Curated annotation (Swiss-Prot):
ATP binds at residues 168-170, 228-233, 260-263. The lineage of its organism: Bacteria, Pseudomonadati, Pseudomonadota, Gammaproteobacteria, Pasteurellales. The gene is kdgK. Pfam families: PfkB. GO terms for biological process: D-galacturonate catabolic process; D-glucuronate catabolic process; DNA damage response. It is an enzyme of class 2 (transferase). Keywords: ATP-binding, Carbohydrate metabolism, Kinase, Nucleotide-binding, Transferase. Its EC number is 2.7.1.45. Substrate binds at residues 28-32, 88, 102-104, 170, 263. The keyword ATP-binding applies. This is 2-dehydro-3-deoxygluconokinase. GO terms for molecular function: 2-dehydro-3-deoxygluconokinase activity; ATP binding.
C-alpha cells in the first residue's frame, strides 16, 4: 500500500450570487485533491492522509465527518480551540469562470505549525511515501512557519519521501512577487514532481512557453514536471526516463465551474503515479476526472458523478 499526505487548508465555501441564493460547502486546493484521489482509488492500494488544523466548532466537526466518509485519514488534522476554519465566496460568470473573496487570516490552518502537536505530525510523516502541498499551503502560513515547514520537508526528502508540489500561485496571498519566488525557490530543490499550471508559472517567472517552464524546473533539479495548460491538456517530462509528451483532453462543451479543474487533475494523476503508471497515462487520468468535475458546480462535486472512475482507473 502507498501512503500519501496532503498538507494545506480547507475552508467553508459559499457559492452563488451576492445577497441572493447561495449554497454552503467546503473546499481548498489540497483538500480537493485529497478528496478526489481518495474517491477514485482503492483503499487497499492507496491511503490518503490530510494534514491541517480545524477549530472545535460544529462546522469543523462536520467537515471532519465528511472527509472521513470519503476515506481520508484525519488523525493528522489538529484541533485548535482558539481558531475556526477560513471562509471563501465564489462568484461565477456566464462562462463558468470564477472570482473569489476570502476570509482566512485567522483560520486554524494558518497556525497549524505553531500547534503543540505539529512536531508529532512531522515525526509521523516519515511513514508516508509521498507528501503533497501547494503554494497556497505555504502562502497562508506566517513567514517563520513557512521556513520551518520547508526545512522539515527538505529533511524528509533527504530520507526518501517524495515531495509533490503544485505552485498554485495566488498573488493576493503574498506580500510581493519576490516573496513568493524566494519561498518557492527554497522548496523546489526538494521536489520530485512539479504539478504546475502554465498561467501560474507565467505570472511567477515570466515563462513564454510551457516548454520554458519544463526546462526551468528541470534545471532546478526536479525530475518529473507536468505543466497543465487548460483546454490544451498537459505536457509532461521526465528527465531521467526521457519521457516527453502532451495529453490533450476531449473538448468539454458544458463548462459550469472550473474551480477544481487543476486540483482534480492532480488527483487523477496521482492515482496513476502511486500505482506506477506512465506519466502519459497519469495525465490522461487527470484530464478524465477534470473533464467531469468542471461540468458541475463547486469545488467538491457529488461523488456519484465520478464513482465509475474507480473501476476505470484501477
Amino acid at each position: 500500500m502507498k501512503k500519501i499526505a496532503f498538507i494545506g487548508e480547507c475552508m467553508i465555501e459559499l457559492n452563488g450570487k451576492p445577497f441572493a441564493e447561495m449554497w454552503q460547502s467546503y473546499g481548498g486546493d489540497t483538500l480537493n485533491s485529497a478528496t478526489y484521489l481518495s474517491r477514485v482509488s482503492s483503499s487497499k492500494e492507496i491511503q490518503v492522509h490530510y494534514v491541517s488544523a480545524l477549530g472545535t466548532d460544529n462546522l469543523s466537526k462536520q467537515m471532519l465527518k465528511y472527509w472521513q466518509a470519503d476515506g481520508i485519514q484525519t488523525n493528522w488534522v489538529l484541533q485548535d480551540e482558539q481558531h475556526q476554519p477560513g471562509l471563501y465566496l465564489i462568484q461565477l460568470d456566464a462562462q463558468g469562470e470564477r472570482t473569489f473573496l476570502y476570509w482566512r487570516n485567522q483560520s486554524a490552518a494558518r497556525y497549524m505549525v505553531q500547534h503543540p502537536d505539529f512536531a508529532k505530525v512531522i515525526a509521523e510523516l516519515q511513514q508516508v511515501d509521498v507528501i503533497y502541498l501547494s503554494g497556497i499551503s505555504l502562502a497562508i502560513l506566517p513567514k517563520n512557519d513557512r521556513t520551518f515547514l520547508i526545512e522539515q520537508l527538505s529533511s524528509l526528502a533527504k530520507k526518501g519521501t517524495e515531495i509533490v508540489f503544485d505552485s498554485n500561485y495566488r498573488p493576493k496571498l503574498w506580500d510581493s512577487l519576490e516573496e513568493a519566488q524566494d519561498c518557492y525557490l527554497q522548496l523546489l530543490p526538494s521536489v520530485n514532481i512539479a504539478l504546475v499550471t502554465f498561467d501560474d508559472e507565467q505570472a511567477l517567472w515570466k515563462d513564454k512557453t510551457s516548454r520554458d517552464t519544463l526546462e526551468r524546473l528541470h534545471k532546478i533539479g526536479i525530475p518529473k514536471v507536468i505543466v497543465k495548460c487548460g483546454k490544451n491538456g498537459a505536457i509532461f517530462s521526465d528527465r531521467y526516463l526521457s519521457q516527453y509528451g502532451q495529453v490533450i483532453p476531449e473538448p468539454i462543451l458544458n463548462v459550469v465551474d472550473t474551480t477544481s479543474a487543476g486540483d482534480s487533475f492532480n488527483a487523477g494523476f496521482l492515482n496513476g503515479y502511486l500505482r506506477n503508471k506512465s506519466l502519459e497515462i497519469c495525465c490522461q487520468q487527470g484530464n478524465r476526472i477534470a473533464g467531469i468535475v468542471i461540468q458541475h458546480k463547486g469545488a467538491i462535486i457529488d461523488k456519484v458523478a465520478i464513482s465509475h472512475l474507480q473501476s476505470e482507473f484501477n
